[in-house]
């Protein structure tokens, strides 16, 4: 079934009032977009981010008459007679199928491949992680995940235990096991992530070496030779003492999920417990690594 959408240019403070009016007019959904395409990755603590130039996108059924809707919107004081808007036809698509069609096997480092479960494996002799990410974050396509996978590919896992702190889909945990880790512990605040990690471990035949916990259930004495945390700068900052105490002396650390401009601050924060390396970058994102003192 096709749709039509009404796109309205406005400023941030008026977006909610216009959105309410559109819902009363029969809109099926409302989406806010940044009119200047400036992404907000992680707001400052206590800050509510607002775009100064907001595009409101209202979706309607294809046969909906938008002419009277536009006329009534002109009566809103925050819009007026000459407000900027556009009506567009929207093709009906199977978005899940389209996403699957565009997710291909990806190589990381010298030996590691991430392969979606519905694709053929390009190199059967490589280390292949078969992934079905479900609803949890982590497919390898995001720069932070890629940075972590490239780091994991270059490690020696002989008799090593690993912690995946914020395991999401389990992509990093499963990759470490397929690369030779003795045992991996995955921790996440989201039960759905725990289930996705479990399913992906079973798909790769490594479920017997993977322990998964919500934070409140993890063992108090949990320690690892290698810890990777692909979360965000805020949690990395707040949880630094907890993360540090889980790494054995001489153990390895990798942190990602942070922007380039956040890397220096987070690196300095962790230098209390780790000898930190120079950051690695991909696009706007960074990865920090270090060795436990």
From Swiss-Prot:
Its main location: cytoplasm. CDD domains: AdoMet_MTases. The keyword Membrane does not apply. Keywords: Cytoplasm, Methyltransferase, S-adenosyl-L-methionine, Transferase. SUPFAM superfamilies: S-adenosyl-L-methionine-dependent methyltransferases. One of its GO terms (molecular function) is protein-lysine N-methyltransferase activity. It catalyses: L-lysyl-[protein] + 3 S-adenosyl-L-methionine = N(6),N(6),N(6)-trimethyl-L-lysyl-[protein] + 3 S-adenosyl-L-homocysteine + 3 H(+). GO terms for cellular component: cytosol. It is found in: Cytoplasm. It comes from the Bacteria. This is Ribosomal protein L11 methyltransferase. Its EC number is 2.1.1.-. S-adenosyl-L-methionine binds at residues 145, 166, 188, 230. One of its GO terms (biological process) is methylation. The keyword Nucleus does not apply. InterPro entries: Ribosomal_L11_MeTrfase_PrmA, Ribosomal_PrmA_MeTrfase, SAM-dependent_MTases_sf. Methylates ribosomal protein L11. Belongs to the methyltransferase superfamily. PrmA family. It comes from Shewanella pealeana (strain ATCC 700345 / ANG-SQ1).
